[in-house]
Design a protein with these regions (language model features):
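Basic, helix-initiating cap at the start of DNA-binding domains
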Residues: 1-27, 31-43, 56-60
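C-terminal peripheral helix-coil segments that are non-catalytic and often amphipathic
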Residues: 1-6, 129-148, 167-201
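Short hydrophobic/aromatic patch on the recognition helix
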Residues: 42-52
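Hydrophobic alpha-helical connector segments
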Residues: 61, 75-103, 144, 154-157
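Short, basic, alpha-helical segments at the C-terminal edge of helix-turn-helix-like DNA-binding modules
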Residues: 64-70
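Amphipathic alpha-helical packing segments from all-alpha helical-bundle domains
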Residues: 71, 86-89, 119-144, 155, ...
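Amphipathic alpha-helical segments used for helix-helix packing
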Residues: 101-121
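Cytochrome P450 catalytic-core helices
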Residues: 161
Length: 201
């Protein structure tokens, strides 16, 4: 019989995922064991394995939740109906806000990729799928400004975003965000122009 503290299965699953998300992001995936997740989520190991057959399944669920949150954030910005450049600015401000938030520990996907380097790893594949979605989203927005060189400009944006998120947990977040947002403005100006050369010129 399931204990009252575990609640309904959906509640137990939510507690497990919430606990894993908090610990994986703050301390690293490999650094956090199943026993600790079970203890802090206040469920049994049997309950965990009923919802997540293995730790990797829990890791994938964690990344899926982060992915869903970011897609929702992007969808909300796009749905506002602003010009494409302003939508990119809104996404950039949201990224900067995350970097400035307490407990920021970098990009969850880049962190996971560092812990799962094998190309055949399902976790690695989930990271790459998320990054491809993000690149495609930015490419589509930049193509609305100017079709030519939209994908190279999007790669520039993603690289700036990666750099800002990596540096944001090492140095002054305010300065990192200021630098990132200034770089985004420069990229938008260069991309909107014609025959001006690459964004780094």
């Amino acid at each position: 019989m399931r204990s009252q503290s575990e609640g309904r299965p959906s509640e137990a699953r939510s507690r497990l995922l919430d606990t894993a998300t908090r610990l994986f992001y703050a301390e690293g995936i490999h650094a956090v064991g199943i026993d600790r997740i079970v203890a802090e989520a206040q469920v049994t190991r049997a309950t965990l394995y009923r919802h997540f057959p293995g730790k990797e399944d829990l890791v994938l669920a964690y990344l899926n939740e982060v992915d869903r949150a970011m897609r929702s954030q992007a969808d909300e910005a796009i749905a506002a109906g602003l010009p494409a450049a302003d939508t990119i600015r809104a996404l950039s401000r949201s990224i900067a806000q995350g970097i400035r938030s307490p407990g920021f520990r970098g990009c969850a996907f880049l962190n996971a990729a560092a812990e799962y380097p094998a190309p055949e790893s399902p976790v690695r594949k989930a990271v790459l799928a998320h990054r491809q979605w993000f690149l495609d989203t930015v490419t589509d927005l930049l193509a609305k400004i100017r079709q030519t060189d939209a994908e190279p400009a999007a790669r520039d944006f993603v690289m700036m975003r990666d750099g800002a998120m990596a540096a944001g947990c090492l140095f002054d977040p305010a300065l990192i965000c200021e630098t990132f947002l200034r770089g985004v403005e420069r990229l938008l100006q260069v991309h909107a122009a014609t025959d001006i050369g690459p964004a780094w010129a």
